């Protein structure tokens, strides 16, 4: 297998970042970069969680900032600003061709995540992928 990195994120029973368990996985993943997935959005204080994830050594956080990127765009903007290039904030969760330009310009994020699934098909749509690519050039 060829691996470029790992995506995971462990929360404790209180839905806070489990420092020790994440630290163990990051150590096991070395030398590969790690991204914290959308479990981040379940924490009660995203700004504090941001600092914890940075301290752990994650390189990216996949987050919607709320239930989806539309609802969380102000939070995403705040997270990008507070990250100060110490970690990449990657908006994802409801990101489609219909909103990527707005989320891009509003948040100033540099990386984005989309499943490119439309019409509840459960499968990424090639036309949606190509449209997303054309909109973020």
Residue locations for each model-derived region?
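Alpha-helix-loop-beta-strand connector modules within alpha/beta enzyme cores
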Residues: 1, 14-38, 74-97, 128-137
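Glycine-rich phosphate-binding active-site loops on the catalytic face of alpha/beta enzymes
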Residues: 1-13, 58-72, 107-129
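Loop/helix-junction capping segments adjacent to catalytic residues or to phosphate/diphosphate-binding pockets
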Residues: 15-19, 43-44, 69-70, 97, ...
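Histidine/lysine/aspartate-rich catalytic loop segments that bind and position anionic ligands
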Residues: 21-22, 31-70
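Generic serine detector
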Residues: 35, 44, 49, 64, ...
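Catalytic cores of alpha/beta
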Residues: 41-56, 77-89, 95-110
């Amino acid at each position: 297998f060829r691996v470029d990195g790992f995506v995971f994120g462990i929360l404790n029973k209180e839905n806070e970042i489990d420092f020790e368990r994440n630290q163990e996985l990051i150590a096991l993943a070395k030398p590969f970069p790690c991204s914290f997935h959308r479990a981040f959005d379940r924490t009660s204080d995203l700004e504090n969680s941001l600092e914890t994830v940075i301290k752990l050594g994650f390189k990216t956080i996949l987050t919607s900032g709320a239930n989806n990127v539309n609802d969380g765009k102000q939070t995403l903007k705040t997270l990008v600003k507070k990250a100060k290039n110490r970690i990449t904030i990657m908006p994802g969760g409801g990101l489609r061709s219909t909103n990527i330009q707005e989320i891009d310009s509003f948040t100033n994020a540099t990386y984005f995540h989309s499943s490119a699934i439309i019409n509840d098909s459960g499968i990424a749509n090639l036309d949606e992928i190509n449209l997303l690519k054309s909109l973020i050039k």
